[in-house]
UniProtKB/Swiss-Prot annotation:
Keywords: DNA-binding, Metal-binding, Zinc, Zinc-finger. Disulfide bonds: none annotated. GO terms for molecular function: sequence-specific DNA binding; zinc ion binding. It comes from Homo sapiens. PROSITE patterns: ZF_THAP (PS50950). Residues 154-178 are annotated as: Disordered. This is THAP domain-containing protein 10. InterPro entries: THAP1/10 (IPR026516), THAP_Znf (IPR006612), THAP_Znf_sf (IPR038441). Pfam families: THAP. Residues 154-168 have a biased composition (Polar residues).
């Protein structure tokens, strides 16, 4: 059987995660512990070597600092008391509810249930009633839809026959939704034609054949003049002139092309 705290209104064990301390061997300190327990327990006559008190009844100054640090760091699960530590903290019992208070609580619960039922009934949708448009909106067209609904109830175990009940006709009146139509036709248009005049720029061509013929006629005349003479220095001059004329003819052809 695990050891339990002997203090009044307490019963912590090591399974509760509390540190348990046995009564000290010092007689003077043990008397102080007995006085503490007897303060809330009239049937307490004195503790023995197996009597324990849990750590909930000691002030923080009664614990060794190193043991507190070790427990916070989870190195150890048990606290240690300093020499001469005496329990001073009593656990206050939870007050038991009185009979009058029990009746008041039951009445409060009933009133809360009634209020919730009333809220649900208010939130439930009721039959839609006919609403008339305002004076300012009487000119607008209104749409009235009246529907007759028949509700058929399912047969119960006691009454196998099907019962059909008619629901009174309800009218719904509301403003007509107006729609706007926009014409997206393409407007008339006129196309204007533009005519551009293009001038043809040609090249002036020269007749190269006539020029070459004139050059060859000049060379032939020179050959006729000097044909009777022997080949002298003048012959070399004529040949050079012929080469110059042929070169000029080639240049004329290149310019015309």
């Amino acid at each position: 059987m695990p050891a339990r705290c002997v203090a009044a209104h307490c019963g912590n064990t090591t399974k509760s995660g509390k540190s348990l301390f046995r009564f000290p061997k010092d007689r003077a300190v043990r008397l102080l512990w007995d006085r503490f327990v007897r303060g809330c327990r009239a049937d307490w006559y004195g503790g023995n070597d197996r009597s324990v008190i849990c750590s909930d009844h000691f002030a923080p100054a009664c614990f060794d600092v190193s043991s507190v640090i070790q427990k916070n760091l989870r190195f150890s699960q048990r606290l240690r008391l300093v020499a001469g530590a005496v329990p001073t903290l009593h656990r206050v019992p939870a007050p038991a509810p009185k009979r009058g208070e029990e009746g008041d609580q039951a009445g409060r619960l009933d009133t809360r249930g009634e209020l919730q039922a009333a809220r649900h009934s208010e939130a439930a949708p009721g039959p839609v009633s006919c609403t008339r448009p305002r004076a300012g909106k009487q000119a607008a067209a209104s749409q009235i839809t009246c529907e007759n609904e028949l509700v058929q109830t399912q047969p119960h175990a006691d009454n196998p026959s099907n019962t059909v009940t008619s629901v009174p006709t309800h009218c719904e009146e509301g403003p007509v939704h107006k729609s706007t139509q926009i014409s997206l036709k393409r407007p008339r248009h006129r196309s204007v034609g533009i005519q551009a005049k293009v001038k043809a720029f040609g090249k002036r061509l020269c007749n190269a054949t006539t020029q070459t013929e004139e050059l060859w006629s000049r060379t032939s005349s020179l050959f006729d003049i000097y044909s009777s003479d022997s080949e002298t220095d003048t012959d070399w001059d004529i040949k050079s002139e012929q080469s110059d004329l042929s070169y000029m003819a080639v240049q004329v052809k290149e310019e015309t092309c």
